[in-house]
Amino acid sequence: MDQNKLNRVLESMKETGIEQLLISDPASINYLTGRYVNCMERMQVLYLDVEGNHKFVIGKLFPQPEMGVEVIYFDDTEDCVAKLASYMRKGTKIGVDKIWPAKFLLRLMELGVGTEYIMLHLSLIISVRSRVQKNRT
C-alpha cells in the first residue's frame, strides 16, 4: 500500500466527514496498492477506515501476495457482504465508490452498517481535499 497516497485519502475522508470508504474500482485499488485485480462480477473491495482498520476483501479464487493491507478471503458459498460488514463500524457515514454493484450496496444497507451512504469516486475525494487546502491559503 502506498502510504503517502493512503494518507491523502484518509485526510480527505476526515475533511469530508466520511469515516469509512469502500473502493471497488480496479484502477483505484491499483492506485493505492500497486496491484491491479479484476474479479469481474465477484466482490472485491478495499475497505478504508479513518481509525486505521483497513482490509482488502476478495474471493479465495484470487489469492494475493503481500500488499500492505490485511487480505480477507471469502468463498463463493459465503455471504461476502456480511463478511465485509463484520469488519466495519456501525453507525457512520460510508463512502462507496461509484462502480460498486448495487447488489452489494443494497445488501450492506440491509445489514444496517451505515447511517448514510455517499457515492463517489476516489479522484473526487482527493480533489475535494485539494480545494479545501487551496481555500485555507
Task: Provide a role label for each language-model segment.
Residues 1-53, 89:
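Terminal domain-start leader segments
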Residues 32-36, 57-60, 67-69:
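Short, glycine/acidic-enriched capping/hinge loops at junctions between secondary-structure elements
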Residues 56-64, 99-106:
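Short, polar loop motifs at secondary-structure junctions
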Residues 3-7, 81-137:
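Flexible, acidic/His-enriched mid-domain "rim/lid" segments that flank
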Residues 7, 64-71, 106:
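A short, polar/proline- and glycine-enriched secondary-structure boundary/capping micro-motif
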Residues 70-81, 118:
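Short acidic-hydrophobic, aromatic-tinged amphipathic segments that line or gate anion-handling sites
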Residues 21-23, 53-59, 93-97:
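Short, hydrophobic beta-strand segments that form beta-sheet elements in well-ordered domains
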